[in-house]
Amino acid sequence: MAENQYYGTGRRKSSAARVFIKPGSGNIVINQRSLEQYFGRETARMVVRQPLELTDMVGKFDLYITVKGGGISGQAGAIRHGITRALMEYDETLRGELRKAGFVTRDARQVERKKVGLRKARRRPQFSKR
């Protein structure tokens, strides 16, 4: 492992991302694929870049990311959380502005479980009066 490498773990919904950042030219590799190849949606790419753009670190780090579980949006959120934690490990003074933007807090919202007697978590079967 490189001596000047910083690490952050990010989680969102059922996704978990491991993020390694080291000084470089702004290369982002996710599961051995480029950011553009991995995320087809522009919104997901934007979410991943948010902490870097906020802290003006876009071309300063190479990112190596492995992410598992969940869907596109959950994985993008997990990566964002991981990048945020890695940046804070690199420079603790960034914590304030990252916290203000809401990137430091782990989004605790999970899928609500399906209940017995209901069709989904809250959707009830149709009610017939007579």
UniProtKB/Swiss-Prot annotation:
Keywords: Ribonucleoprotein, Ribosomal protein
Domain of life: Bacteria
Keyword Transcription regulation applies: no
A single GO molecular function term of this UniProt record: RNA binding
Pfam assignment, any one: Ribosomal_S9
GO biological process: translation
InterPro entries, A to Z: Ribosomal_Su5_D2-typ_SF, Ribosomal_uS9, Ribosomal_uS9_bac/plastid, Ribosomal_uS9_CS, Ribsml_uS5_D2-typ_fold_subgr
One CC-aspect GO term: cytosolic small ribosomal subunit
UniProt family annotation: Belongs to the universal ribosomal protein uS9 family.
Name of this chain's protein: Small ribosomal subunit protein uS9
Source organism of this protein record: Serratia proteamaculans (strain 568)
Origin organism lineage: Bacteria, Pseudomonadati, Pseudomonadota, Gammaproteobacteria, Enterobacterales
